Regions:
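Short, Lys/Arg-enriched, disordered terminal segments
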Residues: 1-3, 303-304
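ABC transporter nucleotide-binding domains
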Residues: 3-8, 13-189, 194-208, 212-214
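Alpha-helix boundary recognition
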Residues: 65, 78, 198, 222-223, ...
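Residues that scaffold the ATP/ADP-binding catalytic core of kinase and kinase-like folds
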Residues: 72, 221, 293, 297
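ABC transporter nucleotide-binding domain
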Residues: 173-261
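Short, charged/small-residue-rich alpha-helical element at the C-terminal edge
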Residues: 227-300, 304
Length: 304
């Protein structure tokens, strides 16, 4: 098992009578992309602010690189960079000057380091342009350049694709993968965009109403419980009629194929049932997604 880079132990934050985060235990390992998922208002940004010591917890501890942040703040945070919510810049200054000023808050950064960070995020050609001329997506990428400027061992990104169009989201996703694969950074990625996390993260935690409701490998969490399958069958109308009569099958959509929700352990049984009923099956494919899993467990948690 890889070394634990970031750990929270019973981390909690209360505002008045409301618990924004309650008894949170996270385990982020070296070199991985860790997805931190939850709907808006789940407590993700509050958690990140506590990790970065921007907000004092009501109770609990944060350990980074094996040490409690409270007693080693300067030492630890010199190896960490986080962008909370949207990055802010001096709009009337150039991208280069912004990174020079913001980087100097940690240490003096060189011209080469600034250009290298801008090159990684695809903004080297715009280094001299004022940030006020940048699109939202370019500002998000500049924020990531700021995060990696001092070569941190841990990068914390809070909703980095927020407000981006599909192309911008794709660029940020590819950038996150590049930081992990080519630069060896451990990345803590907060998002409510579940398909984005599914595409890049090895492990994840799911937060709902301030409480941890799941944590583990994405592949393992996705394989648990009911799944969605798309069935291509002939004759389609007869197959649909059979499926609607089976009590443990939920037909959720029909079109070129039939989308059903079943217990994944009964997929082979359903396939046999259709074949023995005279249905020609040309495709029976799983459609399980992280969103299905997320909706399932958050619905379950809200019913408790």
């Amino acid at each position: 098992m890889s070394e634990t880079i970031l750990m929270t132990e019973g981390l909690s934050k209360r505002f008045g009578s409301r618990w924004a985060v309650k008894d949170l235990n996270l385990d982020v390992r070296a070199g991985e992309i860790f997805g931190f998922l939850g709907p808006n208002g789940a407590g993700k940004s509050t958690t990140i602010r506590m990790i970065l010591t921007l907000l004092l917890p009501t109770s609990g501890n944060v350990k980074i690189f094996g040490k409690e942040v409270r007693g080693h703040r300067v030492e630890i945070l010199s190896r960490v960079c986080g962008i909370v919510e949207k990055p802010d810049f001096y709009l009337f200054l150039s991208a280069h000057k912004n990174l020079e000023l913001l980087g100097s808050l940690s240490r003096k950064v060189t011209r080469d380091e600034i250009y290298e960070a801008l090159e990684i995020v695809g903004l080297k050609a715009r280094a001299g342009d004022k940030v006020k001329t940048f699109s939202h997506g370019m500002k998000q990428r500049l924020g990531i350049a700021q995060a990696i400027l001092t070569r941190p061992d841990l990068v914390i990104l809070d909703e980095p694709t927020s407000g981006l169009d599909p192309q911008g989201m794709k660029e940020v996703r590819e950038l996150v993968l590049k930081l992990s694969r080519e630069h060896g950074a451990t990345i803590f990625l907060s998002s409510h965009l579940l398909t984005e996390v599914e595409a890049v993260a090895q492990r994840m935690a799911v937060l709902n109403h301030g409480e941890l409701i799941a944590q583990g490998a994405v592949s393992e969490l996705l394989s648990d419980g009911s799944s969605y399958f798309t069935i291509s069958a002939t004759p389609m109308d007869k197959a649909l009629a059979i499926l609607r009569r089976v009590s443990w099958v939920e037909v959720v959509a029909e079109g070129n194929g039939i989308d059903v929700r079943i217990d994944s352990r009964r997929a082979a049984e359903l396939n046999r049932l259709l074949v023995t009923s005279g249905i020609d099956i040309s495709a029976f494919a799983a459609k399980r997604t992280l969103e299905d899993y997320f909706l399932k467990i958050t619905e379950g948690a809200s019913e408790v």
